[in-house]
């Protein structure tokens, strides 16, 4: 057999393993676990770091103010050096909509070694400790909107399962062409890297969270020493989950039904920056890991369609059949995520093209890192950030 046949056979074998051996990552049925309401509702501090988020807050903050929570809950919005009137708008929205109590404050510029977001989270948690007796923190991004019962259901899940961290991957916006092409694949690749079922096993080595929506027990945060212990992490959600688990905490991660992002990504550029800003940090800035990742993406996602085309042109049946089988398994595993995002299953066929884009984003992330522009976000650049300690 020639080289293409061998490589295609390897790709097919990889897909058979991914289908059964990677924690059934492709299934989308991991939602909040069975839960019952606590006898006495614990108090919660909702911490929202925000930097130039005025546009998103118009849709997201009213949903937090309107939380139907039987216990005490307060919102601490940390204005991280915004220039678009984020803090002023937040106060105006609170006055207009009423609901939960809102405190808006600013921590000043981050100290050396801190990322801006974690510096803001630190400030919000400190305010909550000083002003409330909160037993839980809800850490949620400024672009994340919550259904009225979101907080109640998160707390019920944590209470029922004796969980220290409950995280939901918010349903991202899918409306524009590039959003439909990129976003479902983004969540699919995340689940492939961090299979939810595997993460949710007590004591599992695989650990992650989704930073847009994290309910964290205060005692667990103090035991884990967060956010101080992860102050330089760009991939802060994964770092947070690892710190909590290392300290003996129990975590849960799944897909959201009541939480969604309001942030639009109307073109390829914003989506590209979202992925590339942290892709190389995820690989811990190691060139050999980068090379292996690129090679793996090529073999797993790009070889099947190449083998089909080459086999059809040359009349070589073996790579054609093996490539078609690998491509079919690939597409089949992507269909549940497309359905979760209410997209046509036919889009699964173009997953190799989307994977190629992600490969290029990863390469670009490394290039920007070595140019001193790694992890650029919201006007800040972290030349050599930590990934997830």
Mark where each language-model region is:
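N-terminal membrane-anchoring/stem segments of glycan-assembly enzymes
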Residues: 1-40, 183-184, 192, 196, ...
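Catalytic donor/gating beta->alpha subdomain of glycosyltransferases that bind UDP-sugars
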Residues: 158-192, 219-222, 226-290, 375, ...
């Amino acid at each position: 057999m020639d080289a293409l046949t061998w490589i295609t056979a390897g790709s097919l074998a990889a897909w058979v393993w991914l289908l059964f051996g990677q924690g059934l990552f492709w299934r989308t049925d991991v939602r909040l676990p069975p839960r019952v309401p606590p006898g006495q509702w614990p108090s919660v501090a909702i911490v929202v770091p925000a930097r130039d988020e005025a546009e998103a807050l118009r849709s997201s903050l009213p949903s937090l103010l309107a939380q139907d929570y039987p216990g005490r809950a307060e919102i601490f919005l940390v204005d991280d050096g915004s220039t678009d009137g984020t803090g002023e708008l937040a106060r105006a929205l609170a006055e207009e909509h009423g609901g939960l109590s809102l405190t808006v404050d600013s921590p000043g510029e981050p100290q050396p070694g801190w990322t801006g977001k974690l510096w803001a989270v630190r400030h919000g948690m400190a305010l909550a400790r000083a002003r409330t007796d909160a037993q839980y923190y809800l850490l949620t991004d400024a672009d994340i909107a919550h259904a009225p019962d979101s907080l109640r259901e998160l707390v019920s899940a944590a209470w029922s399962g004796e969980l220290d961290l409950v995280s939901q991957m918010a349903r991202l916006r899918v409306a524009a062409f590039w959003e439909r092409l990129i976003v479902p694949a983004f969540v699919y690749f995340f689940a492939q890297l961090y299979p939810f079922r595997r993460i949710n096993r007590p004591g599992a080595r695989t650990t992650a969270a989704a930073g847009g929506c994290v309910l964290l027990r205060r005692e667990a945060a103090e035991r884990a020493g967060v956010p101080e212990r992860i102050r330089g992490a760009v991939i802060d959600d994964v770092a947070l989950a690892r710190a909590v688990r290392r300290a003996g905490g129990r975590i849960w991660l799944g897909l959201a039904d009541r939480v969604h992002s309001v942030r639009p990504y109307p073109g390829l550029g914003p989506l590209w920056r979202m992925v590339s800003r942290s892709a190389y940090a995820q690989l811990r800035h190691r060139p050999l890991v980068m090379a292996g990742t690129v090679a793996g993406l090529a073999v797993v996602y790009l070889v099947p369609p190449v083998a089909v085309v080459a086999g059809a042109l040359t009349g070589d049946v073996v790579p054609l059949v093996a490539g078609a089988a690998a491509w079919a398994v690939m597409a089949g595993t992507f269909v549940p995520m497309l359905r979760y995002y209410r997209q046509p299953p036919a889009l699964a066929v173009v997953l190799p093209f989307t994977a190629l884009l992600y490969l290029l984003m990863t390469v670009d992330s490394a290039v920007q890192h070595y140019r001193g522009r790694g992890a650029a976000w919201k006007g800040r650049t972290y030349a050599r950030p930590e990934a997830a300690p």
